Amino acid sequence: MRENVKRVLVIGSGPIKIAEAAEFDYSGSQALKALKEEGIETILVNSNVATVQTSRKFADKLYMIPVTWWTVERVIEKERPDAIMIGFGGQTALNVGVDLYKKEILKKYGVKVLGTPIEGIERALSREKFRETMINVNLPVPPSLSARSEEEALEKARQIGYPVMVRVSFNLGGRGSTVAWSEEDLKRDIGRALSQSYIHEVLIEKYLHHWIELEYEVMRDKHGNSAVIACIENLDPMGVHTGESTVIAPCQTLDNKEFQDMRSMSIDVAKSIDLVGECNVQFALNPLAYEYYIIETNPRMSRSSALASKATGYPLAYVSAKLALGYELYEVLNKVSGSTCACFEPSLDYVVIKIPRWDLDKFENVEHSLATEMKSVGEVMSIGRSFEEALQKAVRMLDLGEPGIIGGKVYNSKMTKIDSLRMLKERRPYWFLYASKAFKEGATIDEVYEVTGINKFFLNKIKNLVDFYESIKNNKGLDQKTLSIAKRLGFSDYQIASAVGLSEKDIRELRQKYGIEPKVKQIDTLAGEWPAVTNYLYVTYNGTEDDIEFSNGIRKLLIVGAGGFRIGVSVEFDWGVVSLLDSASKYFDEVTIINYNPETVSTDWDIARKLYFDEISVERILDLVRKEKFNYVATFAGGQIGNTISKKLEENGVKLLGTSGHSVDIAEDREKFSRLLDKLGIKQPDWISARSIEEVRKFVEMVGYPVLVRPSYVLSGSAMRIVYNDTELVSYIKKATEISSEHPVVVSKYIDNAIEAEIDGASDGRGVYGVVLEHVEEAGVHSGDATISIPFKKLSPETVHKMKESIHSISRELNIKGPFNVQFVVKNGTPYIIEMNLRASRSMPFSSKVVGKNIIDLALTGVIKGFDFDEFVELKAKSWGVKSAQFSWAQLKGAYPFLGPEMRSTGEAASLGVDFYDALLKSWLSSSPNRLPDQKGIALVYGRSNVEYLQASARNLSEYGMTVYTLSDAPIYGYEVTSSGKSVELIKDRKVEIVVTDGYLKSLDYEVRRIAVDYNVPIILNGRLGEELTKAFLLRKSNMTFYEIGEYGAGI
């Protein structure tokens, strides 16, 4: 019997953070679809402006406001929903739901919790209650004791004996968790661990060194009917967070008894917490004896459940939402097979491998070793019919410049066996690259196992790949049989060509001559036992025939997805892909997506007519164009990855939709683009295209420091840096040329104290639609880290007119057909162009939703039909919109928090308002761990740059009612001075409510900034933002507006 509800409130997860990423865009979107199918009105609270979920196609009503209990209470008071769903927005949504329950807000308004009851959620997420629950139902857990203070934690650790694992309650991503090998370790880390717990509780647990970690995904309905959807095996052992682990499904190394015993126990765990919906249950298995423990469960959609869903084809989030409405498993249809019910457990005739993606090089002082805390910012998933094939594909998907596990930079480096084993022992990211290098240099399986704890089954497979590669490299022979084996082992044409001394084109032609072609296979959830009705596809060389027939004689488009997320490429580009899909369906008979990110909406089973879950490379796309006969390939929606390969695709005869690959190359190549601006008479900062440090030094002698070093073909400011002296210059030029060695480095004069602005737009080669965006922070802070407003606040109409004229001129010269983004710095009213991207931009979901027009849809209209004008038409907002960056400093242990031209944020949030300060305050509060500071607390304000803005910030905070302190080494005049050491103690004692600073001061305030983020204290890293935000505290603290997005005249 279905729950009798007509209006349901769904809580989203807010902006993308490390450990709480786009998997909740996918799961929340599926839940909203399931509700809509039932005719239920949906109300969504989510401040993540970048997601598809916050577009009109999913929820009936949308509140883009901070995801907190007190803001959600305002929505409940206004909308009066019958029920609430809190299992589809990560830990953020669960915490909000628990707070609403405990404060009796749900009871007050008669709101029913759908899915797992709050008491069950608490039993799962409180480490102490979970341990007690497991013991009560006779399920094995490691020796462990809970603690709520530092003294108690030290005492419990002595009772258990070192080493111990510290686990944090009501938390995700392992934030604050650690392995303590001694009391000294525990004393150092326990304060941070307790600060990261929502309920100030930790579990001190026996550390299970080198045990195998496994996960089971369980579905359960309200009557106790259960299905185990997937068993996922972590290749990395216990001690590495599961989000940091390379994982494989189905499990490979379990015997039948182990598999069945843990399967049964996972169902018992679900029963013990009264699960309704989906959970994942984590186990530790002793590799040397038949011994295992239950580690934890997550009673919600999670990173693992998103992976399991994409790996098996089983729509977990959709089914979970149906179960939360009261359906039983047998009543829910599996829409992938179209004929089986949700109680059928999936069966796989392929293997899936997930590898995380890290961006640790962007952060100073960060710990690079993998451990109990998540640091990865994204992940990729590959599908193959052998471990070797899937692993090689996954490595290429990481987009690190590695052609596979073998034959790349690490494999061909001068690293010795000892060096490789050291990197493995230190648990550096991408361990498989160092393992293959170690085997190449003569390491044994036992030696690699000793330092990694990785099962020898997997190590043997990697060593076999090394042995095969070395054999063809040494023999230089490539007959039909050898080439066929190489392709079945996952080697790319490039890898094979490098081994035997031929070109990639030679290998492609040889393959086609021998008839060695990849086969298209279909994911049906039941290993071919039932036919599938959806085209959820992958490509393999381990097959003899295609599972599908290819349609001809119709208009077909292939859209290139965004690939794995990283800093600079996140869910906003998936929004671009899905927006293009929706728009293209009006003009094409069959629209197909190729992508390999398990977190995204674009890789859902029911989004595209066809989905290729496969690698994005020139080789793969040429294979698919040969089979499918696509009329066009669209590379502009998914960010940088498509732009990077567009020119090569065009050179190989592929017809690109929109702007030509030649024009894209001009815009992406800093030197070519700078020459174009000179030709058109458009202002830009003084620049030089340099191929040597000597050339740069001559340029610097003319223009003076500081200068900006900018390599070509990069995203999110990779290797981009403001340099202030010769020492920094030598260091950064070296780094930049390593990133883009085929292209010269452009060095430009850095214009300080300038306003930065952008225009998002679409063109048909003549007419232009555009939205003007303005940064709060001065130029020099990467646009992805900046606070951005629509409409502009500081720019003059005359300056904006010049910006529009420049863009109109460029769009005609390059014949831009599609979306674009242009960035300007403005000094004394004069705009200078610093960058142009001929693709969807990071800010496009924000600009589209604020002005109420989908720029991707406009762009495709321009490409297909053209516009009926030849001018710049500005798209204007009816209210104010502000976008704020979400940083994940707390997850990146040791990293020094500061802003610069290289991007470091992991996500973004936005809000709308009746004025700038209304929108700004809500937007900032939407990013974690930001909160309104307690007026009785201390504010710490200091810095050596933007001092006048810091002075204003201190003045505003003082007027707000706070006690303002400043650092003796970088003081703000007129306020009580304190030392760095004293400031650290004040933060640890939880007396500091907010820190406002500016610039790069690592030598004097590293510990202050680091302790602030470790103890969840909001930190503002720019003086100009500090002044505006503290003014917002004064103006808008008690009168923020909380309207539905349509009431602001916004939304798409």
UniProtKB/Swiss-Prot annotation:
Keywords: Amino-acid biosynthesis, Arginine biosynthesis, ATP-binding, Ligase, Magnesium, Manganese, Metal-binding, Nucleotide-binding, Pyrimidine biosynthesis, Repeat. Mg(2+) 2 binds at E296, N298. Gene3D superfamilies: 3.40.50.20, ATP-grasp fold, A domain, ATP-grasp fold, B domain, Carbamoyl-phosphate synthetase, large subunit oligomerisation domain. Residues 1-399 are annotated as: Carboxyphosphate synthetic domain. Mg(2+) 3 binds at Q823, E835. One of its GO terms (cellular component) is cytoplasm. Residues 931-1052 are annotated as: Allosteric domain. The keyword Magnesium applies. ATP 1 binds at R127, R167, G173, G174, K206, L208, E213, G239, V240, H241, Q282, E296. Residues 131-325, 674-864 form the ATP-grasp domain. It catalyses: hydrogencarbonate + L-glutamine + 2 ATP + H2O = carbamoyl phosphate + L-glutamate + 2 ADP + phosphate + 2 H(+). Residues 400-548 are annotated as: Oligomerization domain. It is an enzyme of class 6 (ligase). PROSITE patterns: ATP_GRASP (PS50975), CPSASE_1 (PS00866), CPSASE_2 (PS00867), MGS (PS51855). Disulfide bonds: none annotated. The large subunit is composed of 2 ATP-grasp domains that are involved in binding the 2 ATP molecules needed for carbamoyl phosphate synthesis. The N-terminal ATP-grasp domain (referred to as the carboxyphosphate synthetic component) catalyzes the ATP-dependent phosphorylation of hydrogencarbonate to carboxyphosphate and the subsequent nucleophilic attack by ammonia to form a carbamate intermediate. This is Carbamoyl phosphate synthase large chain. The lineage of its organism: Archaea, Thermoproteota, Thermoprotei, Sulfolobales, Sulfolobaceae. The gene is carB.
